[in-house]
């Protein structure tokens, strides 16, 4: 067995909680957990703890929830724990240089892409959006840049034609803890081999927005189908019909050309709603009108056939 490390864990969402859960059964000593402050959630806007806080408190771990790690007194919280290493997974706060240098072995981060591709906020979604054949996780040594640190360990997985950001998130939430435990063993043994990122291969995973998720019919059918999967479960691809937003859950590409203007409805039947795009035809299969549940196109046509008259154009 490798040396048992004193670990500070910093993370916030479910993705991070799955990594903390793996650490708890790894033989290492979790000396403190940092997570974002409780936030208002739900219709009642009740203050809700993060998934990481819920797990940490359930296991009796000390929890810290600073709004920022810039104030000296908050940095002292980290210093007082005398950690060997700080593990950061989707924490959501910037770690100042002073904090990065406090643990004996520094701070390591689990990132949801094969760096240097897709540095930034939305690596899982952007890998789908771009049509990448594979993605994975990178465990890296943190520095002051945005996902610029040396890479310690990588695990990859294929992206299938059915994957959404939701399914890919689950795959990487399985891979990440495996890579993390292996990396910690290497750090404890002194066998880790840091690899500098190739700056010529860098791409940036820009944040998603609801406006970007609005369907732009001038794009190709292939790109739109990828967007629909990349933006599922958030922010969800959508279009506007009679002034109300309609989310699109699933679509397919029909490999045929058309001379119809982008956005023109070509067919509407139980096989789907076929719409002309900038290149090819997009076949809408599952949609969700405002205030309703997601439904098959057949069910939607039964109640809203007037929305999808062939020859009409969608906005």
UniProtKB/Swiss-Prot annotation:
Short name of one Pfam family: Formyl_trans_C
Catalytically driven reaction(s): L-methionyl-tRNA(fMet) + (6R)-10-formyltetrahydrofolate = N-formyl-L-methionyl-tRNA(fMet) + (6S)-5,6,7,8-tetrahydrofolate + H(+)
CDD domains per record: FMT_core_Met-tRNA-FMT_N (cd08646), Met_tRNA_FMT_C (cd08704)
Key words, A-Z: Protein biosynthesis, Transferase
Highest taxon above the source species: Bacteria
Entry-linked InterPro entries: Fmt, Formyl_trans_C, Formyl_trans_C_sf, Formyl_transf_N, Formyl_transf_N_sf, Formyl_transferase-like_C_sf, GART_AS, Met-tRNA-FMT_C
Keyword Protein biosynthesis: yes
Protein name per UniProt: Methionyl-tRNA formyltransferase
Gene that specifies this protein: fmt
